[in-house]
């Protein structure tokens, strides 16, 4: 009897001694009745017809290959694969949520802001005609409206030639100026000379170099603005494309093996190894990671474009000061009115039925000396500062695609590599294989992940990124070029204050009008660019913690109290054996 007691105490002491060493303990054996598996699977698929009552050989399984009896059937395996792919898509969308929200909101803000600029520029131009040339007002309003409508369409991508827009504006204005200002007494019988006057406008350069100046300014500023909006819209397309990728069957099998095959053995609380997750994600997302190089170039090229968007490359500065340049062009016509009237009288004589008396008015009559006076305005938030703010936020996502595999693993339940974890086949103490890097240029030790080229949809989005990057580089202004004398002379001849932030131009009338150049009216936009409160942004940040709290740890170290109790029992048994 004493021998039996001594033997029992020795066994207890040995087991407790192993516990005192702090080694991780294996989980309890699987449920022999598949009860836990049935309960869990019912959450994914209502009904239990596919779940065996007791473990089965599982000879028909293709992914969760059993080493013994299993609680999974082929139908369950298929459901797990579908669920794994859906989980992957949701994780991708969660990863891109903040970035996607940032670009979508800014694209909407800037598009509407540019429309506001166009609307204000049209109003300023109409006000200039009303205050200085009331006789031209009805027709001028129509021509100005058509011009700025074309400007809006061009910004949105319409196939309109900027030079044609400007030429049409001046071609339409000159006949009105000639018949209403230079020859207001022109008989009705000779008013059919409009086509001749339109042609004479270009041949005689009646507006001097002002049309060419406006072409240069408007063309440069609108091209940059148009590319800027196109780039933002492409950014949205890139994110949408990667958000809804359809992963290969090989990837689906690997995800299933990592996340669900442990359930077939009744190991419901076991987590995949962190290193194993990294390898699987690197393989599944190898094609997506190929986007990284072009995505980085996209953000840097967009930054370079934004840095050059001022003065004649800033549509706010150009369009909001356009009324002053048009006013100067009309003054030029007035100054040369006598000579022009004589020349045009001869040029368009075939269109005139009889001689008429020239009623040219002196140049000072229509000149408002206040037109170029400057009213300085205090600094407020501008579109320029908004653009710079956007770039700074985008740069925080410059490694977005290369960091995606790590993000997915960090936001899904995985076990650290120094704990008991699931390696796709069984429980292991430590997963030693390192995750491969650099996309598809490396080989993996997982035969399921066949190295192929990027999916066609990924290849297409890469081609689009290459194209927009080339456009951005082409349109970007080399550093310092905007300050060159030639460009200053070309872009700031007519009424520019020349300040990078607050630009202003005086107007005629009872005093100076503050021009809201560098948009001081952003408050009109009902948008908020702060993405900190983006829907779901606060949720996915704590996703990992929530998942951890809902799962039990595997192989935890014994608590200090348990160790003390074990030591006490061990010592008691030792003294019993000795005595």
Swiss-Prot record:
Annotated disulfide bonds: 34-71, 64-261, 72-264, 196-348, 251-284, 273-421, 277-409
Propeptide feature ranges: 554-579
Known function: Cell surface proteoglycan. Negatively regulates the hedgehog signaling pathway when attached via the GPI-anchor to the cell surface by competing with the hedgehog receptor PTC1 for binding to hedgehog proteins. Binding to the hedgehog protein SHH triggers internalization of the complex by endocytosis and its subsequent lysosomal degradation. Positively regulates the canonical Wnt signaling pathway by binding to the Wnt receptor Frizzled and stimulating the binding of the Frizzled receptor to Wnt ligands. Positively regulates the non-canonical Wnt signaling pathway.
Signal peptide span: 1-24
Residues bearing attached sugar chains per UniProt: 123, 240, 417, 494, 508
Phenotypic effect of disruption: Perinatal death, developmental overgrowth, cystic and dyplastic kidneys, abnormal lung development and ventral wall closure defects. A proportion of mutants also display mandibular hypoplasia and an imperforate vagina. There is an early and persistent abnormality in ureteric bud development in the kidney due to increased cell proliferation. In the developing kidney, cell proliferation is increased threefold in cortical collecting duct cells and apoptosis is increased 16-fold in medullary collecting duct cells.
UniProt region (Disordered), positions on chain: 533-552
PROSITE patterns: GLYPICAN
One GO CC annotation: side of membrane
Protein name stated in the entry: Glypican-3
A single GO BP: regulation of non-canonical Wnt signaling pathway
Similarity-based family: Belongs to the glypican family.
Tissue spec. comment: In the developing limb, absent from the apical epidermal ridge at 11 dpc but highly expressed in the underlying mesenchyme. Expression in the mesenchyme at this stage is asymmetric with highest levels in the regions of the distal mesenchyme within the progress zone and within the proximal anterior and posterior limb bud. At later developmental stages including 12.5 and 13.5 dpc, expression is restricted to the interdigital webs and the regions of chondrocytic differentiation of the developing bones.
Membrane topology: Lipid-anchor; GPI-anchor
Entry superkingdom: Eukaryota
Residues found modified as Pyrrolidone carboxylic acid: 25
Cell location: Cell membrane
